[in-house]
């Protein structure tokens, strides 16, 4: 069953002769529960693609359907609510709120929804993330790996249908990297969430169900490696 | 340009908004300093021009110098400009209609002397030959002699002396003697020294050497400096080449060189005082001190703004400076980059500020000059205009530059200490602890998650906010203190000049001898429109309860059952006044002259200010007594402690609320009985010596031009200690104008200081928002809607404003209370706060903070989330 469909997506920076085409007529679709790795060299447009899918950047043209809704027809408030409830975005540089502690950072999407986090669910999540004894710490009191796990927790707390991860392990050592990836895979399998992950790491890419290769803003390859 | 400088300029350009706001701050600060300095010099200049107008533009005169010694004086290094003057003396004006202006008084000047002695031509031309004169317009106006241009004057000129041969000094008023029959006759004569003929060629305004009381009307003639014989002598009016206190030594020394003595030197103290050249100099010192206090306040407010701007800039650039440091920038280079920033801002801001300051002052002075005129009594054609001197410009530049230097000093030192490691570490974030950002659970429950984040943000950057909260507090306190003071002064001034029905009062003390003569002289002044001569004595009347009004009974206790002793003023007015007063009241004046059956007109009106239960002052107005025409009362003049004083039966001839000029409305314990002079003299005839001494004499005047009349009266009565002059109209007007005048300056000052504070708030808030761009983008990326973003900003503004109010309000209230206590001695009113000012101030603080926040977040809200997230804070 299809969860995400991208149609003729273009993103251009600048105009005229200096225009840079970060995305050039990209179209593909991803099914529910699929784990897709996006690979490509620096500046190939893969991060831009991810951001546009996540609703934090705007395409120059083209459409993005998530669960049948074209997200760029939504107004700003509805788009914010879409981000809050449907998408979990994980950045390379964690982007945590410095004044909020681990628990608050993780439950941020719920708090913005004025909802109370489910205690048991939160505890389970903290346990899986290995942050149980760090729940009251501020981001600056954590290591890089821990901070990344907090940002993963934040992406997962709403059990969003779509998980987007932009080189989540780019800044981490190999041990932490492995932990993070297996964590993401576990959620992908357990909750049947769709996961799109950008990586430079060949080994990580090989763990995915499908690999999409992007060069110069175009899809150069799209192969399913396991079904 | 070296790399440090270009880096600095780039960062200024990158933070265009903050740079502009800081430059505006510098402009305002320089403008205010310029305005204060400009006002100070303009005001002194006004005083100088006024002194020149009234006494001429010269510093000293050496009298009666022989012609052969002229060059000794004129070409002395101590002398800048010199003109010759010759005093030809007095000649009788035979047909004068003014009994006090019986002479013409002639002085001659060399050509440039007319200008230097402030001779103002009214018609015709100035004399250019020895046999020509221009006469004072007072000859026509006061003495009533109409000369026409071209008429010939035959003058027997000479000195005045008394009949027994004593010399009368110039400018003394005409000397009268009393003969055996009590009639006045002129007690002086003129000793003729020369007889000459002159042609009238022009009419001039009253010259500086003619006073309104002078016995002679002025006239000026021409003196040819080339036509002196060696035996002639003349007065030399001079300006000193070096104007300071040393002239009190150099000029007398010069006089001695010219064969004269120090006694022949007179200084133009009037003018010298306004140049600050006096032996002791209070006014000058006071003005200087006042200007300095204002400038210090301006500098403090400006430093708090500009310091903040530099501190923010250094904090923002710490990563940049750290990187520069890691590739080898020295401490000196880092420090100088901040000073260069200050230099750049100053080079743009200070010149603009000085222009703005002078421009603003020119407009303000033009607007308030008419008000000021009534406050400081200057000659009619001297007005306050802006004067720009090189010295005041230099002072403004130096002070503004100093302000910037002080502001940049600490940030520059901090910049010099930035190390490479600071660039790598985000120092502030590291220090953040859980405890610092801990908030009550209640906040989130009651106000929502946004409020909680807002509060945490506030707590996080406590230090950064401190300077801005300080600015908030300073502007709040300044504003509230001034408005509290203004409203208190308002309640005070309302009551002061109520019920006065004359313009100028001249009162005599009881040892004044020739009062009648002085009354005549005063009444003869051409500016007096009407006058009332009065005498009054206070005493008591004993009355039964039914004769006393209900109001009076409320305020006065009976001395025994049903009997009241109430104050009464027995007042006489001159016959002319009495006749018209009786007419106004509807009585027949003839009935009031019978000294066997004395009667008077009862003024039965009282007015009082009254407080009840600590509430506001209330004005009460009504009858004092229940008396009717035909009733009698027993008047007892006050006589020390003697209770058994003799009483006089007086009849009430009429009862009225009308008052003759000079009589004031009484309070409820007293009334006034107006009688004729004849009756008054009869009643007071058998007074004891003490009682006679308690009689007060005065003359009250109405006029169209109280200021000129007051000056004339001052000149007329000069030196007479027994006379005091009260210009009620001018006092009331001055009081009103002073409050307007002060209002313009004080509120102008407060507004500009507030603008600096607002600029400060704007800078810190917008920088703070800019630094948190990434964080805001983060919140939006995880799904914060614009609505809840606004909610968060709103809460942050409110918390922020509240913090300012938390400190500002108690301080303001405390100051208001102190002010209230200080003015308790003047008028006792209950302590109240100017609620509307407080409400306004509170609202303004919140609005300013909120508007700034809104403005600062406007761009951020529209910004692409990803662009903000990519920002690395460099």
Question: Model regions: which residues?
Answer:
Chain A
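ABC family nucleotide-binding domain
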Residues: 2-214
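H-loop (His-switch) and adjacent beta-strand-loop-beta switch element
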Residues: 211-223
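ABC ATPase nucleotide-binding domains
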Residues: 226-227
């Amino acid at each position: 069953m299809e969860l995400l469909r991208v149609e003729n997506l273009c993103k251009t920076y600048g105009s005229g002769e200096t225009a840079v085409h970060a995305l050039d007529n990209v179209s593909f679709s991803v099914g529910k529960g699929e784990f897709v790795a996006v690979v490509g060299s620096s500046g190939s447009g893969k991060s831009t693609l991810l951001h546009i899918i996540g609703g934090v950047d705007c395409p120059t043209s083209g459409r993005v359907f998530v669960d049948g809704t074209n997200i760029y027809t939504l107004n700003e408030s509805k788009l914010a609510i879409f981000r809050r409830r449907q998408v979990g975005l994980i950045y390379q540089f964690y982007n945590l709120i410095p004044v909020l502690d681990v628990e608050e950072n993780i439950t941020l999407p719920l708090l913005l929804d004025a909802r109370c986090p489910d205690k048991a669910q939160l505890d389970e999540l903290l346990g899986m993330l290995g942050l149980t004894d760090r729940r009251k710490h501020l981001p600056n009191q954590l290591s890089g790996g821990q901070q990344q796990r907090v940002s993963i927790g934040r992406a997962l707390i709403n059990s969003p249908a779509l998980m987007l991860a932009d080189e989540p392990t780019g800044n981490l050592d190999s041990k932490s990297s492995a932990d993070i990836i297996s964590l993401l895979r576990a959620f992908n399998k357990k909750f049947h969430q769709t996961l799109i992950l950008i990586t430079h790491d060949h080994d990580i890419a090989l763990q995915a169900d499908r690999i999409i290769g992007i060069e110069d803003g175009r899809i150069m390859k799209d192969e399913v490696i396991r079904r | 340009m070296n790399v440090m400088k270009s880096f600095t300029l780039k960062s200024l350009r990158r933070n265009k908004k903050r740079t502009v706001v800081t430059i505006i701050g510098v402009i305002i600060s320089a403008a205010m300093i310029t305005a204060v300095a400009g006002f100070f010099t303009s005001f002194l200049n006004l005083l100088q021009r006024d002194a020149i107008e009234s006494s001429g533009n010269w510093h000293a005169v050496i009298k009666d110098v022989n012609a052969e010694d002229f060059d000794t004086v004129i070409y002395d290094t101590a002398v800048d400009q010199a003109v010759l003057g010759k005093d030809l003396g007095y000649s009788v004006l035979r047909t004068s209609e003014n009994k006090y202006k019986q002479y013409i008084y002639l002085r001659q000047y060399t050509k440039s002397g007319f200008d230097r002695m402030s001779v103002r031509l009214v018609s015709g031309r100035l004399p250019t030959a020895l046999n020509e004169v221009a006469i004072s317009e007072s000859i026509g106006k006061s003495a009533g002699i109409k000369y026409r241009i071209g008429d010939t004057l035959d003058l027997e000129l000479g000195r005045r002396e008394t009949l027994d041969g004593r010399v009368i000094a110039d400018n003394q008023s005409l000397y009268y003697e009393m003969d055996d029959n009590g009639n006045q006759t002129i007690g002086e004569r003129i000793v003729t020294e020369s007889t000459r003929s002159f042609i009238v060629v022009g009419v001039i305004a009253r010259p500086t050497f003619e006073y309104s009381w002078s016995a002679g009307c002025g006239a000026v003639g021409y003196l040819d400096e080339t036509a002196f014989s060696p035996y002639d002598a003349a007065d030399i009016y001079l300006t000193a080449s070096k104007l300071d206190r040393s002239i009190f030594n150099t000029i007398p020394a010069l006089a001695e060189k010219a064969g004269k003595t120090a006694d022949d030197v007179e200084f133009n103290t009037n003018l010298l005082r306004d140049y600050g050249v006096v032996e002791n100099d209070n006014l000058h010192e006071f003005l200087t001190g006042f200007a300095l206090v204002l400038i210090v306040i301006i500098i403090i407010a400006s430093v708090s703004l500009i310091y903040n701007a530099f501190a923010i800039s250094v904090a923002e650039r710490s990563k940049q400076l750290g990187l520069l440091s890691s590739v080898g920038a020295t401490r000196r280079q880092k420090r100088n980059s901040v000073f260069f920033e200050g230099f750049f801002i100053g080079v743009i801001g200070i010149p603009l500020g000085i222009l703005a300051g002078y421009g603003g002052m020119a407009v303000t002075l033009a607007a308030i000059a008419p008000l000021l005129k009534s406050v400081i009594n200057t000659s009619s054609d001297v007005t306050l205009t802006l004067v720009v001197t090189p010295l005041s410009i230099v002072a403004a530049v130096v002070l503004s530059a100093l302000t910037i230097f002080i502001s940049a000093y600490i940030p520059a030192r901090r910049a010099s200490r930035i190390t490479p490691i600071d660039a790598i570490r985000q120092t502030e974030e590291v220090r953040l602890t859980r405890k610092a950002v801990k908030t009550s659970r209640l906040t989130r429950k009651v106000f929502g998650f946004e409020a909680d984040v807002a509060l945490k943000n506030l707590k996080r950057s406590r230090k950064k906010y401190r300077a801005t909260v300080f600015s908030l507090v300073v502007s709040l306190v300044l504003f509230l203190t001034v408005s509290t003071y203004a409203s208190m002064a308002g309640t005070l001034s309302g009551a002061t000049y109520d019920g006065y029905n004359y313009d100028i009062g001249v009162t005599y003390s009881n040892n004044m001898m020739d009062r009648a003569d002085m009354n005549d002289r005063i009444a003869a002044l051409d500016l007096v429109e009407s006058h009332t001569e009065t005498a009054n004595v206070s005493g008591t009347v004993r009355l039964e309860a039914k004769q006393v009004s209900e109001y009076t009974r409320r305020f006065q206790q009976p001395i025994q059952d049903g009997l009241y002793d109430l104050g009464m003023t027995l007042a006489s007015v001159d016959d002319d006044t009495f006749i018209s007063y009786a007419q106004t009241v509807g009585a027949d004046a003839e009935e009031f002259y019978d000294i066997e059956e004395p009667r008077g007109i009862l003024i039965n009106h009282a007015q009082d200010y009254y407080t009840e239960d600590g509430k506001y002052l209330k004005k009460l107005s009504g009858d004092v007594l229940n008396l009717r025409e035909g009733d009698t009362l027993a008047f007892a003049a006050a006589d020390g402690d003697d209770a058994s004083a003799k009483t006089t039966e007086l009849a009430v001839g009429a009862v009225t609320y009308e008052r003759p000029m000079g009589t004031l409305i009484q309070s409820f314990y007293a009334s006034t009985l107006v009688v004729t002079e004849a009756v008054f003299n009869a009643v007071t005839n058998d007074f004891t010596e003490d009682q006679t001494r308690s009689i007060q004499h005065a003359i009250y005047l109405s006029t169209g031009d109280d200021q000129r009349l007051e000056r004339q009266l001052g000149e007329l009565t000069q030196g007479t200690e027994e006379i005091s002059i009260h210009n009620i109209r001018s006092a009331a007007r001055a009081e009103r104008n002073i409050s307007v005048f002060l209002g313009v300056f004080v509120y102008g000052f407060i507004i500009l200081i507030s603008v600096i504070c607002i600029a400060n708030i704007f800078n810190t808030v917008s920088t703070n928002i800019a630094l948190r761009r990434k964080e805001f983008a983060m919140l939006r990326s995880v799904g914060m809607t614009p609505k809840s973003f606004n909610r968060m900003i709103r809460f942050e503004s409110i918390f922020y404003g509240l913090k300012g109010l938390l400190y500002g309000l108690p301080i303001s209230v405390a100051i208001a209370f102190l002010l209230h206590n200080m003015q308790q001695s003047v008028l006792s009113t209950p302590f109240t706060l100017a609620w509307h000012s407080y409400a306004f101030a509170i609202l303004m603080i919140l609005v300013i903070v909120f508007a700034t926040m809104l403005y600062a977040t406007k761009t951020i809200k529209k910004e692409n989330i990803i662009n903000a997230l990519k920002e690395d804070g460099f």
